[in-house]
A protein has these predicted regions:
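An acidic, glycine-rich, mixed-charge low-complexity segment common to nucleic-acid enzymes
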Residues: 1-126, 130, 180-272
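Compact beta-sheet-dominated globular domain cores
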Residues: 135-200
């Protein structure tokens, strides 16, 4: 198949792969945010928000050489009528590798395992989430939305790559921290009500901090209805308000409140 200096000419196989990935992305990730709480000694957290605007890059499509705009690629793909001629010479060199990783990405909520900072020399990437699938490990590079240091640690996924265990260690900066819990919500919802992943041991270790996060960012009624045993363990103390939580744990609650306050701004940034 012909190629130019930028990308390879798309064929039927590539178009069909993109259709399949887009339909899975629409079902599992588009319009969703995930709150990831992680850490061994100290619990930290970040939010990852997915939108249709992320799809083309994550799937290995060079938007500069595509014959239609990214939002048109996505719309036609989820409708099942994307054609090779729509894509032109937009198939990136690592397209096949990215499509393999993207299949695992669709199970993001239940397969993410670790979080780490990455080498600052890599353009604009300042966080990565390690994910273990049945056949591969990969990392999501993510841009921090907003420049204020005091703002919420919220990310938009920007890169996707398959990495060997050795490569993961080479690219990682500092400790790769295990994930304690992952919650999800639709972007039009204000609070988290679904638990996607749970590490029982870390949840027990960080119970006080986790309780403050869930009380601030979560829908307490919905969480209690869906996960009564877990919530009974976490909320067993008689908290009348967030002010009853220790000063240490309250820092996390305040950061969660900042996430809630800036959500509209964040989602506007993602839609551009």
């Amino acid at each position: 198949m012909r190629s130019n200096s930028y990308g390879r000419l798309a064929g039927k196989e590539e178009a069909e792969a993109i259709i399949s990935l887009a339909q899975q992305f629409e079902k599992n990730l588009n319009g969703k945010s995930f709150l990831i709480c992680f850490g061994t000694m100290t619990l930290r957290f970040l939010e990852v928000s997915f939108s249709a605007g992320n799809f083309s890059h994550l799937a290995g499509i060079d938007k500069h050489n595509c014959r239609i705009k990214p939002h048109e690629v996505y719309a036609r793909a989820i409708a099942g009528n994307l054609k090779p001629q729509d894509l032109g010479y937009s198939i990136a060199p690592k397209f096949k590798m990215k499509t393999i990783a993207a299949k695992f990405l669709n199970e993001f909520g239940s397969t993410a395992t670790h979080v780490s900072a990455v080498n600052k020399r890599r353009s604009k990437v300042n966080a990565e989430i390690w994910i273990s699938g049945s056949k591969a490990g990969f990392a999501i590079g993510a841009i921090h939305i907003g420049s204020k240091r005091s703002g919420p640690v919220t990310f938009a996924p920007t890169s996707l790559q398959l990495l060997s265990d050795i490569e993961l260690q080479e690219k990682s900066v500092g400790t790769v921290e295990p994930i304690a819990i992952i919650l999800s919500r639709r972007n039009d919802e204000m609070s988290y009500s679904v638990i996607e992943f749970l590490n029982e041991n870390l949840t027990e270790i960080h119970s006080s901090s986790l309780a403050s996060i869930l009380l601030s960012c979560g829908n307490e009624v919905a969480l209690r209805n869906k996960y009564p045993e877990l919530c009974d363990r976490l909320f067993d103390k008689d908290f009348e308000s967030l002010y009853d939580i220790s000063e240490y744990a309250t820092e996390y609650a305040e950061e969660c409140n900042r996430i809630n306050a800036r959500r509209a701004e964040i989602e506007t940034s993602l839609s551009k």
